[in-house]
Amino acid sequence: MKLTVLGGGGVRSAFLAKSLAYNAHRIGLTEVVFLDNSADNLAIFGEIARYVFNTIRPDIQFSTTTDPVAALQDANYIITTLRVGGDESRIRDERIALEHNTLGQETTGAGGFAMAMRSIPAILRYCRLIEEHAAEDAILFNFTNPSGLVTEAIIKSGFKRRVYGICDAPSELIRELPAILGCEERDLSVECYGLNHFSWFTHFTVRG
């Protein structure tokens, strides 16, 4: 089972590698490829990810590449975590928005819209490559922000694979709530709407 990460040269690569390594047995993962368009970033963060796999799951075949076709060939799972324009573009987006007294955050408001304008064309190009080279039953997990807009664009493009838009912001809050409410996480029931950094909870219930 092959998993490909698009944007594998980012600063969070080591954390993603650790999570994948510890949970590989759940999906029968045998091969992981981290793709990035920056060989310099892969030489740093990709190699850290390699060390993680070699330490935790040395039996898994791990590689890095700047070649999207090689990365996506026969991939069963694809995770996208792109930052088109790099951190410099994020800084520019947020500062321009703040200068006009509007929200500069990268998933909502003017900053989020600017990021969507860069992210969507790049993601759709990768989607075409996924259709051409990945396994027929491949599943795409989109972490690229703004996740809601990007995932909607993928679906509306006619993408012929399953796709899920993912964000860990709501789940992080759920993990913090038990300490606030004085209960165990298993005793907590929540109702959450929205996606990404623009989600909200309507109510929390402890033990029913």
Where are the model-predicted features located?
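N-terminal Rossmann-like dinucleotide-binding module
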Residues: L3-V32
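Gly/Ser/Thr-rich loops at beta-strand to alpha-helix junctions
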Residues: G9-S13, A39-N41, N142-V150, A169-E172
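Short, surface-exposed basic-aromatic patches at helix termini and helix-loop junctions that form
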Residues: Y22-H25, R50-T55, E132, E152-V163, ...
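Substrate/ligand-engaging "lid" and interaction regions
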Residues: Q61, K160-R162, I166-G208
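N-terminal Rossmann-like NAD(P) cofactor-binding module of classical short-chain dehydrogenase/reductase
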Residues: L72, N76-T81
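Rossmann-fold NAD(P)-binding glycine/threonine-rich loop
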Residues: V84-G158
